[in-house]
């Protein structure tokens, strides 16, 4: 059934949107003129012998505009350190659900 985005797609979408918003925000603050910004993320999850997962996320970002290499590197660096990316890279403690 087609019920919309999967939970994994929603997670990747959140990271992607954070990266795009960060690029737009930094460009505006620095006076860098940009056009359309797109981010495409993909992930591969591998199960370890103990049942845990190692997940690799790859990101491709396109920024339209006549940007210098320095500006492009700055914007992508900032995108790679956006809030949601930093949260996901951090250590998580996910407690078991409680019945209410």
PLM region descriptions:
Residues 15-19:
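Alpha-helical metal-binding/catalytic segments enriched in His/Glu/Asp
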Residues 1-13, 23-100:
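Extended beta-strand/beta-hairpin segments
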